[in-house]
């Protein structure tokens, strides 16, 4: 691959109190990773080197003090040192305002780099929502924070990815009792279009999308719930009329059987609520799951697991999901519109 075709990634550690520093260290110690992208890491240098010690590995890097121009002369990652603006030390293995504030500071820099065109995509280590809220973030999650920082008013949602299988959901972090009232043909259709667009941006020409029902056995033809008949099926039909290869609705207890093995029927599954997809994905491969911040104008990916405070600093963190997030960020950055 010629150097000009390499995607340019802005990378941050996530919450320093968790496993992010050791995951990023283990990722960048892999020569193959460094040869797949031009990387600028925004991080406290002491925390990054601590991550190296915990992971038992090192990687070369070149320090840069300014971010106005990025000179990707070779495969060596760039490091832009960023100290906590509060000047406080980071607590270990626990949520804190210091860790949350630092996470937001470094993410804001990565967003600015990518929004301005100096990088193509963002990869960040695990965040802790309690830390983010302690630091003053008043959004329900980082996806809404990203959208506000970018001034983005269009539709967006969280995608979960396992290997080559993508999932999205019509509703997300809401009480289960609220889900039926939040469903509409427009919202189901929007979720289908968002994941179709994201897969195309990651290089797949015509994604096959399976859509999940809401009720047991798809409502059994209206016997216990009409959402499949009145909302989901019409939304799927409209998506098909728009040229999207969507199919469904399928019962929630069988649709994920259709995406296993070599004869997989779908590239993506759209679910109606959070746990319909999350339970299946985590059972299929918890250590490889990736979260993509879908619908935003720039590609953003992160491992789907959390900060794992219980094992942070022990060198036991599995880099598998972070490696998958890196691969997805590279693909989406390369195909960014």
Swiss-Prot record:
Subcellular localization, as worded in the UniProt entry: Cytoplasm
Q: Which SUPFAM superfamilies match?
A: Isocitrate/Isopropylmalate dehydrogenase-like (SSF53659)
Q: Does the keyword Phosphoprotein apply?
A: no
- Pathway given in the UniProt record: Cofactor biosynthesis; pyridoxine 5'-phosphate biosynthesis; pyridoxine 5'-phosphate from D-erythrose 4-phosphate: step 4/5
The biological processes this protein is annotated with in GO are:
pyridoxine biosynthetic process
Q: What class of enzyme is it?
A: oxidoreductase
Highest taxon above the source species = Bacteria
What catalytic activity does the UniProt entry give for this protein? 4-(phosphooxy)-L-threonine + NAD(+) = 3-amino-2-oxopropyl phosphate + CO2 + NADH
Other remarks on this protein = The active site is located at the dimer interface.
Known partners and oligomeric status: Homodimer.
**Listed name of the protein:** Putative 4-hydroxythreonine-4-phosphate dehydrogenase 2
């Amino acid at each position: 691959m010629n150097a000009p075709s390499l995607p340019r990634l802005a990378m941050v550690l996530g919450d320093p109190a968790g496993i992010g520093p050791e995951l990023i260290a283990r990722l960048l110690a892999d020569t193959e990773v460094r040869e797949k992208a031009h990387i600028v890491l925004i991080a406290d240098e002491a925390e990054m080197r601590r991550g190296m010690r915990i992971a038992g590995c090192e990687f070369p890097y070149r320090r840069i003090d300014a971010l106005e121009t990025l000179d990707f002369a070779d495969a060596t990652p760039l490091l832009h040192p960023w100290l906590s603006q509060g000047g406080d030390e980071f607590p270990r293995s626990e949520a804190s305002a210091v860790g949350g504030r630092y996470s937001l500071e470094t993410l804001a820099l990565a967003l600015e780099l990518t929004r301005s065109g100096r990088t193509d995509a963002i990869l960040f280590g695990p965040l802790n929502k309690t830390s983010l809220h302690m630091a003053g973030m008043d959004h329900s999650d980082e996806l809404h924070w990203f959208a506000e920082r970018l001034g983005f008013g269009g539709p967006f949602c969280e995608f979960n990815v396992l290997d080559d299988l993508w999932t999205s959901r019509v509703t997300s972090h809401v009480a289960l009792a609220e889900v039926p009232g939040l469903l509409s043909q427009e919202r189901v259709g929007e979720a289908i279009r968002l994941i179709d667009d994201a897969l195309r941006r990651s290089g797949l020409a015509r994604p096959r999308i399976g859509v999940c029902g809401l009720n047991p056995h798809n409502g059994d033809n209206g016997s216990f719930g009409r959402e499949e008949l009145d909302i989901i099926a019409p939304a799927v039909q409209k998506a098909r009329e728009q040229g999207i290869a969507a199919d469904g609705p399928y019962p929630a207890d069988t649709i994920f059987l259709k995406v296993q093995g070599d004869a997989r029927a779908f590239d993506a599954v759209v679910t109606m609520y959070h746990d319909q997809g999350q339970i299946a994905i985590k059972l299929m491969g918890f250590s490889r799951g990736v979260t993509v911040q879908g619908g935003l104008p720039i590609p953003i990916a992160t491992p789907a697991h959390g900060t794992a405070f219980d094992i942070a600093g022990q060198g036991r963190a599995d880099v598998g999901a972070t490696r998958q997030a890196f691969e997805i960020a590279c693909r989406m950055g390369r195909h960014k519109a």
